[in-house]
Each structure stands twice: as structure tokens, then as C-alpha cells.
């Protein structure tokens, strides 16, 4: 793939103007300070619980739970990727993706409000639902596919979208859902974890919040826990910031610095991983023992049409089902280049049988495969070999 915002194999969810820098340039330059002679290009992490603060306490940095220069640079970088060239977008970073998700839901909703969540999303969402309901908030759920959340929007205060969904990889029409939600007075938050800001821009599609776990492909090395929220509405973002301060859901300076460093290679990583994911999906579709193969980049995938209208890249996750739990476990054990792990988006390929957790409504033989940055031919060969060696 090229470093432009759109490619021949990806969708048209955002257009690049002739004068705008490409994704690779933006990723490398995102959030960097103005150059100062003899100073580093990307300053190191600032470790500080407090700052010099004589007299009037007004200023950007007062106490370590409120602000940190290392966060500020990272927030600027992510904002430049989520809404390129757009002023007025604020980004806040958090200690994890769940901290970011919770910050939006618990800062925007009150007892008596109604929230709409996907019933096929991230496996921690049922825990969030239970907590919301304990606070007197009504929660309705519907699947991601076929825009089913439209049917339960009436009277909602907030709509939560996860597209593509994890782990099923269904896609919904963000623009259509946003239009309907806003017409009824609801806010819209989109979990953009699987797509990344280079694969989908929820704010451009009309959403009020773009939320993600930076632990996954955004940072991509499997060594950082991080989350973020980006939004345009100053009042809504002030509430998110206040929630972060109250609960202390802040990232460490080292994590923030590692994340910023990693963003420089984001375009290189997503293009390699996403193009390899398509090759993997094309190879797996020929196997008779595999059913339910999903990858939004496949032209015949049920999600492809909608995905091609709003996504710039299709992600690095492929899902499929093997005939049984035993076959799936043998297949995973036989892999040599794919690590058994419960995350996705890293440079090292990972896979797991999602049914082992009990939180996803998937078949026992369902596999979520996160495609890494290995050589495509090597990875495909490893997957096919493992399938051959574990034939029943």
C-alpha cells in the first residue's frame, strides 16, 4: 500500500487533498515540538508528580495527575491522526482502553438515561453494562451488523458503536447511525480500536467521540497499555477530562513516550499487517475445514460494501471457525510463527480460541487471528502447515 490516505485495496472513508501530507508523513511528524537547537526531536518522558508552582497556580502543568508534557505531545499526535488538519479536536490519553471507554460512558450518562451498546462487542462491555445499570442507567443492546442498533435508539442519551466489531468483524454504517442518533438527541461514540486512525476516522463520519485502546495496533509492540478519547465538543470533553482527574485513570510518562515513539511507524505497520491479513484470508478461504471466515477486506465479505464506504484500511484481524474445540486447540499448538495471546494489533502475529474466555457468543472452534509484520509467505505457509498437520 502507498502512504496516501486511500489505496486501491482499501475503502474511501476519507479523502486526501492534493496538498495534504500522506499518512506516513503525518505519523512520523505527529505531535513533535518545534525544533530547538541541541534539543532532541522527541523529548524524553517527563517524570514529575509536581511542578514548580510559586504564586498564581494558573498554567499548563500544576500536578502530575492533571497534566504532563509527555501526555500533551502524545495527545497532539493522536489528534492529528484522528482529525488531520482540523482545529478544535481535543484528545485525552488514559491508562488503558477500558479507562477511556469508561470515561465517556460514566462522564456523559446519569441515572435515568438510556445507553445503547453492541451485544457483540468487546468482552468487557457486559461488565460495563452491569455497572451502568447499578447506577440507574438503562442499557439496551443490539448486534453491530445490519445497523441493528437503529431499532433500539428511541430515547437514548448515548449510542456506543464498535466497528469493525471484536471479535466477529461485523461493520455498521457509522454515518447512518450517527444521523439517526443525533436526530433523537443522542451522542455517538465509536470504538476505533481495530481500525486505528489510519483505517477509519469516526469524527469525520459524524461521531462525537472516537475512543480506542492504544494497547493494540496504534502502538503495536505489545509493551504498552494505553487508551484515548478524541472529540470536538468542548463541554463533553471537559466532562471526560474531569472524570480522568477524579479517578486518576492516567498513563505513566514512560508509557506515553513509548506510545508516541511507536506512532512514527504506524503507517508502515498497518500497511504491512493489513495487506498480509488480506493474503492470509485469501489463503484460508480455500480450506474446506474452515467456516465463517471473516475479513472486511475480502470483496465477498458481508461487511465489505459498508466497510469500503467508510474505512481507509481494513485492519489486521481475521476470524474463522474450525470444526471443534479440539481441532482449534491442536491447530493453535501447531503454529510456529503465531503466538498464543489474547491481544491483537502487534507486530508479532497472535491467535486464540475466543471461546475459552466464555464472554463471547462464538462457536467453540472460533479463532481470532491477529496478523503481524512477518513475511506474508512465511506466515501463510505456517498457517497452512498447521492446518495440514492437525487434520481430523
From Swiss-Prot:
The catalytic activity of this protein is classed by the Enzyme Commission as 4.4.1.1
Q: One GO CC annotation, please?
A: cytoplasm
Q: Which cofactor does it need?
A: pyridoxal 5'-phosphate
Q: Which GO terms describe its molecular function?
A: cystathionine gamma-lyase activity; pyridoxal phosphate binding
Family in the record: Belongs to the trans-sulfuration enzymes family.
Q: Which cysteines are joined by disulfide bonds?
A: none
Organism of this sequence: Streptomyces coelicolor (strain ATCC BAA-471 / A3(2) / M145)
Its protein name is Putative cystathionine gamma-lyase
Composition-biased stretches (Polar residues): 1-10
Q: Which PROSITE patterns match?
A: CYS_MET_METAB_PP
Could you tell me which CDD domains the record lists for this protein? CGS_like
- Ranges for the region named Disordered are 1-41
Gene from which the chain derives: cysA
Q: Name one GO biological process term.
A: transsulfuration
For this UniProt record, the keywords arranged alphabetically read as follows: Amino-acid biosynthesis, Cysteine biosynthesis, Cytoplasm, Lyase, Pyridoxal phosphate
Subcellular localization is given as:
Cytoplasm
* Reactions the enzyme catalyzes: L,L-cystathionine + H2O = 2-oxobutanoate + L-cysteine + NH4(+)
What superkingdom heads the lineage?
Bacteria
Q: What is its main location?
A: cytoplasm
> Residues where N6-(pyridoxal phosphate)lysine occurs?
216
Major enzyme class: lyase
Its pathway is:
Amino-acid biosynthesis; L-cysteine biosynthesis; L-cysteine from L-homocysteine and L-serine: step 2/2
Amino acid at each position: 500500500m502507498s502512504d496516501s490516505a486511500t489505496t486501491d485495496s482499501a475503502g474511501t472513508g476519507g479523502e486526501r487533498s492534493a496538498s495534504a501530507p500522506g499518512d506516513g508523513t503525518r505519523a512520523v511528524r505527529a505531535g513533535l515540538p518545534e525544533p530547538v537547537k541541541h534539543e532532541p526531536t522527541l523529548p524524553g518522558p517527563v517524570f514529575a508528580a509536581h511542578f514548580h508552582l510559586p504564586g498564581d497556580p494558573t498554567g499548563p502543568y500544576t500536578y502530575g495527575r492533571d497534566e504532563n508534557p509527555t501526555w500533551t505531545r502524545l495527545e497532539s499526535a493522536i489528534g492529528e491522526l484522528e482529525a488531520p488538519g482540523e482545529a478544535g479536536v481535543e484528545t485525552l490519553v488514559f491508562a488503558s482502553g477500558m479507562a477511556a471507554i469508561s470515561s465517556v460512558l460514566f462522564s456523559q450518562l446519569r441515572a435515568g438515561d438510556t445507553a445503547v451498546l453492541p451485544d457483540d462487542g468487546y468482552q468487557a462491555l457486559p461488565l460495563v453494562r452491569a455497572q451502568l445499570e447499578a447506577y440507574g442507567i438503562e442499557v439496551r443492546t443490539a448486534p453491530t451488523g445490519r445497523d441493528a442498533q437503529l431499532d433500539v435508539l428511541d430515547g437514548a442519551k448515548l449510542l456506543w458503536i464498535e466497528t469493525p466489531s471484536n471479535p466477529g468483524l461485523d461493520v455498521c454504517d457509522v454515518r447512518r447511525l450517527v444521523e439517526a442518533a443525533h436526530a433523537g438527541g443522542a451522542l455517538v461514540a465509536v470504538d476505533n480500536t481495530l481500525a486505528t486512525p489510519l483505517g477509519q476516522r469516526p469524527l469525520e463520519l459524524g461521531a462525537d467521540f472516537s475512543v480506542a485502546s492504544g494497547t493494540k495496533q496504534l502502538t503495536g509492540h505489545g509493551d504498552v497499555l494505553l487508551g484515548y478519547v478524541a472529540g470536538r465538543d468542548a463541554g463533553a470533553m471537559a466532562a471526560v477530562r474531569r472524570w480522568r482527574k477524579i479517578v486518576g485513570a492516567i498513563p505513566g510518562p514512560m508509557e506515553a513516550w513509548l506510545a508516541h515513539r511507536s506512532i512514527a511507524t504506524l503507517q508502515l505497520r498497518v500497511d504491512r499487517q493489513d495487506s498480509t491479513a488480506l493474503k492470509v484470508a485469501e489463503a484460508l478461504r480455500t480450506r474446506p475445514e474452515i467456516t465463517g471466515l471473516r475479513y472486511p477486506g475480502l470483496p465477498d465479505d458481508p461487511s465489505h460494501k459498508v466497510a469500503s464506504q467508510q474505512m481507509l484500511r481494513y485492519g489486521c484481524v481475521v476470524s474463522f471457525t474450525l470444526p471443534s474445540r479440539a481441532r482449534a486447540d491442536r491447530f493453535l499448538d501447531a503454529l510456529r510463527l503465531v503466538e498464543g495471546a489474547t491481544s491483537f494489533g502487534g507486530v508479532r502475529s497472535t491467535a486464540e480460541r475466543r471461546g475459552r474466555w466464555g464472554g463471547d457468543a462464538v462457536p467453540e472452534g472460533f479463532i481470532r487471528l491477529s496478523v503481524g509484520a512477518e513475511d506474508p509467505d512465511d506466515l501463510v505457509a505456517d498457517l497452512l502447515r498447521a492446518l495440514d498437520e492437525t487434520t481430523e
